[in-house]
Structures are given as C-alpha cells and as structure tokens.
C-alpha cells in the first residue's frame, strides 16, 4: 500500500499489524515520526488478562521473545524507496548513500528498504566513522554493520576481568565481529 502524510498513525498501525507493508511517498521526516508512533503503539502493555500469566521463567522469556518478534514485524512494514544511487527520493530525505554503500555494496537499480532497517544502517555507519568507546580497552572500536556490539559491557567486562588459567597463552575469538573481545584478550597478554 502507498502511504503519505495523510495516513494516520492508528491506521498505519492497523495495517502493519495485519502484515500490510506501507511504501512511504510523503515527507521523509514524517515517515520517521510515523515509525516512532508505530513503536509507541507496539510497546503498549497488553490489557490485563490478555496474556496468560507465565508459570515459569522459560515461559516468560518465550512470551517476551514472541512480543519482540511481533514488534519487529510491525515496525518493518514501513518502507522507503531508494533510487539507484541510494538517494531517498522523498522531501527532506536524509543522505544515506555512504551508509548504504558501506553495508550493502554498490547499487545499480532502485529498491525499497524498511525505514527501521535503513536507520540501523545509518546508525552503524556513524559508529564506523566515529567509533564506539570501549572502556575496558581505553580506546574506540570502529565496527562494521551487523557485528557484535562492542559496547555490550557485560561481555567485555567479563572477558577483561575474569581470572584466566595460569597456563593460558593462546585463545581463539571465534566469530569475531568488531574484534573487541580479541583486543581485550590481547591487552591481557593472550595471543
């Protein structure tokens, strides 16, 4: 469905909940505002009694994961167009070319992307350019899009502070994304 500045947040939310994608043709900043409004609606607590009270922690976790999946599916329904050069052909469209090139590679034809996904690309690009401060390293890491967050402190601090076996001289960081865990281990003298 085509959506523009006349589409209300309530109507957009109903459509998104039904699985209807909305291709935005209005003002880009209004699309961002609509995404925020959709998120607010998706984050509302269910009515009392609407969900079965979980009997175990595992059930509570499963309910949480299902709710997060539904939220993600709803927010992914708002789409924006990109031209062949990763330009957003909407009024007040943000410059996303460098972010898209870094994450997606060269584009040769027009395409469509979820606004939420596009904003994630832009956020990752800003991290790549400016870096993310990792206190355990006393330095910045410049991660690529789609890798382990270098600022997930609970993991980084654990690797930085946990006692290591005395004979440990070599470790493998399997699945290295940003390399932050390998850098923390290297700082501790591990090869």
Question: Which stretches of residues belong to each language-model region?
Answer:
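Generic structural signal for short, solvent-exposed loop/turn connectors between secondary structure elements
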Residues: 68, 104-110, 135-141, 164-177
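N-terminal auxiliary segments of SAM/dcSAM-dependent transferases
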Residues: 1-132
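Conserved SAM/SAH cofactor-binding pocket of Class I
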Residues: 152-191
């Amino acid at each position: 469905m085509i959506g523009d500045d006349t589409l209300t947040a309530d109507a957009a939310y109903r459509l998104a909940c039904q699985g209807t994608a909305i291709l935005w043709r209005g003002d880009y900043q209004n699309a961002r505002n609509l995404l925020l409004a959709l998120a607010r609606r998706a984050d509302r607590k269910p009515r009392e009694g609407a969900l079965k009270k979980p009997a175990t922690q595992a059930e509570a976790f499963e309910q949480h994961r299902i709710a997060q999946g539904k939220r993600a599916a709803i927010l992914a329904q708002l789409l924006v167009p990109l031209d062949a050069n990763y330009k957003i052909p909407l009024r007040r469209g943000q410059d996303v070319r460098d972010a898209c090139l870094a994450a997606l590679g060269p584009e040769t034809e027009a395409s469509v992307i979820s606004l939420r996904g596009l904003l994630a690309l832009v956020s990752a690009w800003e991290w790549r350019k400016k870096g993310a401060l990792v206190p355990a390293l006393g330095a910045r890491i410049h991660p690529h899009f789609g890798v382990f967050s270098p600022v997930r402190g609970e993991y980084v601090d654990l690797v930085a502070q946990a006692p290591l076996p005395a004979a440990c001289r070599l470790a493998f960081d399997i699945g290295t994304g940003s390399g932050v865990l390998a850098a923390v281990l290297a700082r501790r003298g591990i090869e």
